[in-house]
Amino acid sequence: SIQKVFCPEAPRIMLILNPAAGRGRAFHRLSEISRAFESAGCKVTTFITQKRGDASRFVMEHGADFHRIVCLGGDGTLNEVASGIARSGLSVPVGYIPGGSANDFARSHRLSRDISVAVHEILYSSGKQMDIGKLNTRYFVYVAAFGAFTRTSYTTPQALKNTLGYAAYLLSGIRDISTIKAEHIRITADSEVHEGNYLFGAICNTLSIGRMISLPTKFVAMDDGVFEVLLIRMPDTILE
């Protein structure tokens, strides 16, 4: 059960939904999630995205009017919400109910998909600070990457994701193998210079990338002000 929030006025919840996330499962959970917040004494206003960039725009235009901003969608939707927060300088707490296909962020933070648990944590937990990266003018929550398979998340058709879920990314990744090429990169990090031909590179703040690459938990902390850099060199031979 979810207790009521004690507040001089009903806590206003901005619920941002990506209806296509998770093969449409996020959309089908909307009513149950709204009822869970309302049963705790909250007033819920739902914003539904229709295209890329909507979530950031919603936050920048309306986020200041709410006590909590809750994202219901996948990693991409959460990234947009965080970008909107950073760009507008808001200090409104953000809650996340994972509803995507990969859910790397939720897995790294051990966030529950159970609605009652998720709503309770959003309303009553003390919350925590989290690092956000910035690349030129763009912000990212958990990874900024280049090279092999990085275009897959953008080019995988939504209809295919709706049908196959996470497997759609795998199929699209196989399709993209023929386009893989190395990038010559020079990187300075921690006063060290790394230069070479790389198939893949990522600046990340996560324990997993695309559910295919896992980082050791003892080296990763999402709130230490430090990002991890993952580089995969172009092999010199086929055996490598």
Tell where the protein language model's regions lie, with residue ranges:
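Short, solvent-exposed amphipathic alpha-helical segments in soluble enzyme
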Residues: 30-33, 86-87, 157-158, 217-220
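Short amphipathic alpha-helical segments
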Residues: 27-29, 82-85, 107-109, 214-215
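Short Gly/Thr/Asp-enriched flexible loops that form oxyanion-binding sites at enzyme active sites
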Residues: 77-89
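ATP/NTP phosphate-donor binding region
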Residues: 1-72, 79
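Phosphate- and divalent-cation-binding pockets in alpha/beta enzyme and binding domains
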Residues: 54-57, 80-81, 104-105, 151
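Catalytic phosphate-donor-binding core of small-molecule kinases
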Residues: 44, 124-125, 173-185, 223-240
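Catalytic core of DAGKc-family lipid kinases
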Residues: 17, 40, 49, 87-203
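Internal anion-binding site segments
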Residues: 190, 197-240
